[in-house]
């Protein structure tokens, strides 16, 4: 069982601050979702939360991780009063989204789930792979998506136990082991009855940061399906429209890291995304 220190958060900077959109991930992979959300909602305020004290989530027992995330959100909601919360993490979404909605019914939650439905609609060969963390692969929720939307396809679930950590290293500018990447993605590629896998669903928000590496190392071209834009669109659809005469008190977008001690590479990355540390 993995443990992480308890965390607390400061209150929002002022009483008249605009209620933010809170984007949450276990690390920095959710920045892919933040990037798309800002494109669609440039006038909104964001708080990005990286639970780096608990990263990676794959090392946790499910009950302990569920308890941690639900408790963490109680503190985040009290501190930042978000208008909506985006769980930009497949592992957290498939495990705890229902618990969060039950615990905090006043806050709308948008989850991140494997993009199996659009993959099934888009595939030409009928061979689709889902590249995910082992936790996401294990969850009944993922298999329910296949049963609901992709019974006409052959869907292979691939649990990559090291890619999220590799992605974090890549984002930091560190050298990565490309042989390890090849080993992790190889099971995604199937040849069957003259057909080949033509879509790989990126079912972890860290993975789009490795998309160019995947393309270069893949045995043949496929469509690497990134759900970030769809998550951003769903968020927009749940927000209340602004009044034409609404006066905004826009403050800086914030970065919150639960370790309270981000290293230089993370600080530089967050600042490159225009985030200010809380």
From Swiss-Prot:
The keyword Cell wall biogenesis/degradation applies. One of its GO terms (molecular function) is glutamate racemase activity. Pfam families: Asp_Glu_race. Keywords: Cell shape, Cell wall biogenesis/degradation, Isomerase, Peptidoglycan synthesis. One of its GO terms (biological process) is peptidoglycan biosynthetic process. Provides the (R)-glutamate required for cell wall biosynthesis. This is Glutamate racemase. It comes from Brucella anthropi (strain ATCC 49188 / DSM 6882 / CCUG 24695 / JCM 21032 / LMG 3331 / NBRC 15819 / NCTC 12168 / Alc 37) (Ochrobactrum anthropi). The gene is murI.
């Amino acid at each position: 069982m993995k443990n992480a220190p308890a965390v607390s958060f400061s209150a929002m900077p002022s009483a008249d601050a605009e209620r933010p959109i809170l984007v949450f991930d276990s690390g920095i992979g959710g920045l892919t979702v933040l990037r798309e959300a800002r494109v669609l909602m440039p006038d909104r305020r964001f708080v990005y939360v990286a639970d780096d004290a608990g990263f990676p989530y794959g090392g946790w027992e499910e009950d302990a991780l569920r308890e941690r995330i639900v408790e963490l959100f109680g503190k985040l909601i009290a501190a930042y009063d978000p208008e909506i919360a985006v769980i930009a993490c497949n592992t957290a979404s498939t495990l705890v989204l229902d618990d969060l909605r039950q615990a905090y019914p006043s806050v709308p939650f948008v989850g991140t789930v494997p993009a199996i439905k659009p993959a099934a609609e888009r595939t030409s060969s009928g061979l689709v792979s889902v590249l995910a963390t082992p936790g996401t692969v294990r969850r009944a929720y993922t298999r329910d998506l296949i049963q609901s939307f992709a019974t006409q396809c052959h869907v292979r679930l691939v649990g990559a136990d090291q890619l999220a950590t590799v992605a974090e290293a890549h984002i930091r500018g560190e050298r990565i082991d490309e042989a390890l990447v090849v080993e992790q993605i190889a099971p995604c590629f199937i040849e069957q009855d003259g057909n080949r896998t033509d879509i790989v669903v990126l079912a972890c928000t860290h993975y789009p940061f490795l998309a160019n590496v995947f393309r270069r190392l893949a045995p043949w071209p496929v469509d690497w399906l990134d759900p970030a834009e769809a998550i951003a669109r769903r968020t927009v659809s749940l927000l209340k429209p602004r009044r034409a005469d609404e006066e905004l008190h826009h403050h800086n977008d914030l970065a919150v890291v639960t370790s309270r001690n981000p290293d230089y590479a993370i600080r530089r990355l967050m600042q490159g995304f225009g985030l200010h540390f809380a």
